Amino acid sequence: MRISLFSGRGTELVPGLVSAIHKQPVTVPVLCTFAGLEEDEQSDQRHHGGPDRALHYYPADHYLWWQTWQTALGLPAPRTPWQPAAFGENLSGLGLTETQACIGDVYRLGEALIQISQPRSPCFKLNQRFGYGQMSQVMQLSGRCGWLLRVLEEGMITPEATMELVDRPYPELTVKRTADILFNQVRNEADLLMLLENPALSPNWRQHAADWLEHGTVADWQRRLLGPESLRLS
């Protein structure tokens, strides 16, 4: 499967809010390190980046769905066009979505070896990016979040490289199912235990599962999805 590469640096998304969501196509070979693409940056180190969130993949398949969603609701044009890199992804391609990709999947991308570690957790910066106050919530509910990956082996990646599946150790745990267990379904102890015990799932997501099991209440996603009061859109 052919993959497009994107990278970017932190810039001001709106006054007072810096983000590295603005990505540009990578046009020359780039080194993929354990921290991600060499030319890429994460502005919010607390919620982005790190060894388990080195890369973000977003399916190009979804862009037509978003355009249809916008048109069907009669919404104004988004601040950012519906096209690859709009969601701040590093990797994008056609033919692989959250219903097919699985936690723990290992792929060869150029010389690098990468592994799916967790679904993406949408945040309020997407609302500002597109100009829709409920964008992050729709993304979470629809399951069109994309996913994050860790780098198992560093290596060079060329533009328009191909990504090939090497191993799928957990075919029962798709990215979509993983996201639904935490985001979109009632508390299910067996499902939460499955997440907690999966060694390929990121520690952050395993902790979310542990917390829900221990406390019996779902996490409050409001601040992540909507942001501070001063930055909320109607």
Predicted regions and their residues:
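Electropositive, beta-rich accessory/interaction domains or terminal extensions
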Residues: 1-128, 134, 167-234
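A short pocket-lining beta-strand/turn micro-motif at the edge of beta-sheets
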Residues: 28, 145-147, 161
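Loop/turn positions that initiate beta-strands
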Residues: 104, 154, 158-161
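A mid-sequence, solvent-exposed acidic-amphipathic segment
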Residues: 133-153
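Short hydrophobic beta/alpha edge segments that flank linear recognition/processing sites
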Residues: 162-166
